[in-house]
Amino acid sequence: MADRNLRDLLAPLGIDAPVRELREMTLDSRKSSAGDLFVAIKGHQTDGRHYIPQAIAQGVAAVIAEAQGEVDNGTVQIMHGVPVVYVNDLNNKLSQLAGEFYCHPGDKLHLIGVTGTNGKTTTTQLLAQWSHGLGETSAVMGTVGNGLLGRVAPSENTTGSAVDIQLDLQQLVRQEATFAAMEVSSHGLVQGRVAALPFEAAVFTNLSRDHLDYHGDMEHYEAAKWLLFSTHNVKQQIINADDEIGLKWLSRLPQAVAVTMENRLPENWQGRWLAAREIKYHDKGVSITFESSWGGGTIDSSLMGAFNVSNLLLALSTLLALDYPLEKLLETASCLEPVCGRMEVFTTPGKPVVVVDYAHTPDALEKALMAARLHCQGKLWCVFGCGGDRDKGKRPLMGGVAEQLADYVIVTDDNPRNEEPQAIIADILTGFLDPGRAIAIHGRVEAVTNAIMQAKADDVVLIAGKGHEDYQLVGHRRLDYSDRLTVARLLGVIA
């Protein structure tokens, strides 16, 4: 739809809209300008229809709004000369409309969707790095940002709006991207933001407690993740069989690829598979020997921990399922690098090994600590906090995990937002059998400094919770802060 005309855009929905040339599509009235199409949806927190007058005042050419109440589907109202077209179930139609508006960019590259509680960022980055090594022009979309490898622009959400996703994909196509690995969040699935995307492969990493403030319970959270497989006609489905939910899903997905590092293939499994046979952890990373439906081999990687072995095997299985040659994948595996802020290691002679990780759920913290322990000769330190205005139930669980798996624990502020930091730390400490084992230090810089200065050279210090983030949310303020830069400064290295 090169001319971006309102009539042509809405015709497939059976709506007779007036002819209007359109420049860009936007959900934010504050960012709308002359010639744009403003889309007014009823969101989780705000109703975009309240901002139609503001968008019209800023010169938009047309408005599409959610139909509700007395206003019927297809109704066209003229407000100050601007057509406002009402559409039923607009949220669920928006991905398709945005795809049409931006000429369906997802059709022009290999698009991979990765969902799960943990491991999405690392798995997408590994997919992009690995495919790039095989000649693709690769991109990532997710928590760290969107863009070609090495040129990623920060993003506000793991999965952007339906409009932003299609626009970002169009920009990637214009930059000649041929491969894109996208993190697909549960929020994004429930809200239909990826509904019209033509994923060639869908990957499931794992499921553990997170986002219950939004989904309510684990059953609804699981159902949200399942949408990637139940509502998309994805040819290649790659499932972590070591996860209980993944194992259950495999019974519904006989054509999927089952991936295991714990020899947990489903009983009498007839489908494709990949399994680790031997895993050796060492101070430089890990060596993995595997077998699969495509053959076997050994991969040497600088990644840390068991869960990164799982991420690596999921990425490998995905690329094999997409017909990338095993021989070439093995040749390029050693070039894979750890992801920024994901079990990222900082070292300098005479100082402890410091690991910065994004772990902010009980399961992720457990896996990060277990990963760090595999590479630890001395004592294991853990510095972490929990975000304010988010799931309070996970706070004591994370406290219990830290007490059980670390030798020393420092509890500090994460992103307190509008909660009292003291109250958040108090919630965390209720999970300790012996709260006296934890040291509470509110200032995050002070907490990180304290751990690194006290730890010995053969110790490992895990700084968990913020990973790649370069800010801290305190009240309504967004402060400049980075665990990575703080650690690098203390160790005298470059982040």
From Swiss-Prot:
The chain residues annotated with the modification N6-carboxylysine are: K225
Return one Gene Ontology term, BP aspect.
Answer: cell wall organization
The sequence motif named Meso-diaminopimelate recognition motif is recorded at: 414-417
Give UniProt keywords alphabetically.
ATP-binding, Cell cycle, Cell division, Cell shape, Cell wall biogenesis/degradation, Cytoplasm, Ligase, Magnesium, Nucleotide-binding, Peptidoglycan synthesis
Q: Which InterPro entries does this entry report, sorted A to Z?
A: Mur-like_cat_sf, Mur_ligase_C, Mur_ligase_C_dom_sf, Mur_ligase_cen, Mur_ligase_N, MurE/MurF_N, UDP-N-AcMur-Glu-dNH2Pim_ligase
Which residues make up the binding site for meso-2,6-diaminopimelate? R390, D414, N415, P416, R417, G465, E469
Single GO term (MF) = UDP-N-acetylmuramoylalanyl-D-glutamate-2,6-diaminopimelate ligase activity
Q: Which metal ions or organic cofactors does this protein require, according to UniProt?
A: Mg(2+)
Q: What is its main location?
A: cytoplasm
In terms of Pfam families, this protein maps to:
Mur_ligase, Mur_ligase_C, Mur_ligase_M
**What does the entry list as the binding residues for UDP-N-acetyl-alpha-D-muramoyl-L-alanyl-D-glutamate?**
L27, S29, H44, Q45, T46, N157, T158, T159, S185, Q191, R193
Q: Pathway, per UniProt? A: Cell wall biogenesis; peptidoglycan biosynthesis
- Its domain of life reads Bacteria
- Name the NCBIfam families on file: murE, PRK00139.1-1, PRK00139.1-4
Q: What does this protein do?
A: Catalyzes the addition of meso-diaminopimelic acid to the nucleotide precursor UDP-N-acetylmuramoyl-L-alanyl-D-glutamate (UMAG) in the biosynthesis of bacterial cell-wall peptidoglycan.
Stated family = Belongs to the MurCDEF family. MurE subfamily.
Protein name, UniProt field: UDP-N-acetylmuramoyl-L-alanyl-D-glutamate--2,6-diaminopimelate ligase
